[in-house]
């Protein structure tokens, strides 16, 4: 495997993690102001689903690049 491809995939995983954490913080800050527990639970569920999807996409991306290189 090429080292630049490995570095690129690691950076992509870090980027996805930062995006997920940032969006979770935005959801929490917004729904703390509205203070609706049902909306907060739904938003947390949606953020969790997005986190799982982004993590799975980064793993698929990493495997695809490592199989190419």
Curated annotation (Swiss-Prot):
Annotated GO CC locations: host cell membrane; membrane
Topology of this chain in the membrane: Multi-pass membrane protein
Coiled-coil residue windows: none
Main subcellular localisation: host cell
TM regions (residue ranges): 7-27, 42-62
Subcellular location(s) of the protein: Host membrane
UniProt keyword annotations, A-Z: Host membrane, Membrane, Transmembrane, Transmembrane helix
Keyword Signal: no
Protein name from the UniProt record: Putative transmembrane protein ORF34
Organism from which the protein derives: His1 virus (isolate Australia/Victoria) (His1V)
């Amino acid at each position: 495997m090429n080292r630049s491809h490995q570095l690129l995939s690691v950076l992509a995983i870090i980027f996805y993690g930062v995006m997920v954490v940032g969006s979770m913080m935005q959801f929490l800050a917004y729904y703390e102001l509205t203070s609706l527990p049902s909306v907060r639970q739904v938003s947390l569920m949606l953020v969790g689903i997005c986190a799982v999807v982004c993590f799975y996409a980064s793993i698929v991306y990493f495997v695809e690049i490592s199989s190419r290189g």
